[in-house]
Regions:
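Non-transmembrane, aqueous-exposed alpha-helical and coiled segments at domain scale
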Residues: 23-198, 207-355
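Basic/polar N-terminal segments that are highly enriched at the extreme N-terminus
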Residues: 1, 20-24
């Protein structure tokens, strides 16, 4: 009899789980909708406005055990922004980070940042729908983030960055907004979102990827790129997204260099291999990347704008990556050489013969 009651109880609990999940999803969807409505009100745009970008960590953040992906549906329903239209991106964040929403209008340069109040998400759906915006969101900020505007209004930029108007997310959100407004490609922005922000290091990864793809194009299904990252910097996150060259699938091996080693091979940026897994052989390039190779326009304002401005002036070089890149060595790779470059205790630059 006791076992029977336990079984009935378990069945009832299992029956309740889908309903609880649906309730959580409805609440998150309503949250995304409220964020979009508030942004539309504050920025003065209508549904489907192609000038508007949305950035959010919805889908990454988990709030009191609730996943947050349904908030994206709420945004799309209200503002029309979507992943498919290339005007909604989800910068990567750890699941315990706050859930936030950011809307940017490139026609005005203005942006609104909203951070969810976790206490509001503990309400019933009916209670939640009745809450005013200042109880749904723990932080609501508005600022003009266009870099040209900020260059002429550094006092406003000082407030935005120094007072953390976007709760510490200022650099990444402002940089992504500005390159999106200037026509950055979808795949580049996807890689930027994976890195969780845009910086010149990610842009250098795009340049290197374009260069390698030109010199060592993939020609059949047996081929893939392998990366020996020595030294590593932000560029590696772009390779993982663009080439599926991840450490977990042995597509990337990351190693640091000492200051002395960096001096021995100036500007070295790693070893890039087109590997044929059927033939067990490949072609390799040891590359150098020199950020100072081109005399780019310089930012003259406060430090918060320097890398954002550099991101923008680097954009035209996507089609001219060789302006920054030098081939240090080209060589053939067999299985033994590849293993030596990948294995602990072996220095890949010494194996490649450049150190």
């Amino acid at each position: 009899m006791k076992m029977r009651y336990q079984t009935i109880t378990m069945v009832l609990l299992l029956a309740l789980v889908p309903g609880l999940a649906m309730a959580d999803n409805a609440l998150m969807e309503a949250l995304g909708g409220k964020a979009a409505q508030k942004a539309m009100q504050d920025l003065g745009f209508e549904k489907g406005d192609a000038n508007v970008l949305v950035l959010t960590d919805a889908g990454h953040a988990i709030v009191d055990g609730q996943t947050s992906q349904a908030a994206i549906k709420g945004i799309t329903n209200e503002s029309g922004n979507s992943i498919g239209d290339g005007n909604l991106f989800r910068p990567l964040r750890a699941h315990w980070k706050p859930l936030w929403f950011y809307f940017f209008d490139k026609s005005t340069g203005e942006a609104v940042y909203l951070e969810a109040n976790s206490e509001a998400l503990s309400k019933s759906l009916d209670e939640f729908l009745d809450l005013p915006d200042d109880q749904v969101f723990s932080k609501i900020s508005k600022a003009n983030v266009d870099i040209e505007y900020l260059q002429n209004h550094t006092d406003e930029g000082n407030v935005t960055f120094n007072d953390k108007a976007f709760n510490g997310n200022e650099f990444g959100l402002v940089a992504m907004s500005n390159v999106w407004a200037r026509g950055a490609s979808y795949d580049f922005l996807q890689a930027t979102a994976f890195h969780d922000h845009l910086c010149p290091g990610v842009t250098s990864g795009l340049h290197i990827a374009e260069f390698v793809e030109e010199k060592l194009p993939i020609t059949n299904s047996s081929e893939s790129y392998k990366v020996i990252s020595c030294p590593n910097w932000c560029k590696e996150d772009l390779f993982q997204m663009r080439w599926d060259a991840t450490p977990g699938k042995s597509g990337m091996f990351v190693m640091a260099l000492t200051d002395a080693e960096k001096k021995a091979v100036p500007n070295v940026a790693g070893i890039y291999i087109r590997w044929n897994d059927t033939a067990k052989e490949g072609d390799a390039l040891v590359l150098a990347y020199n950020f100072s190779a081109v005399d780019l326009p310089k930012w003259t304002g406060p430090s918060w704008g320097s890398k954002i401005y550099q991101d923008i002036v680097l954009m035209p070089y996507e089609n001219n990556p060789e302006a920054f890149i030098t081939i240090l060595k080209e060589f053939k790779v067999d299985a033994a050489t590849l293993a030596n470059m990948q294995n602990a205790g072996m220095h890949p630059l010494k194996v490649a013969g450049v150190m």
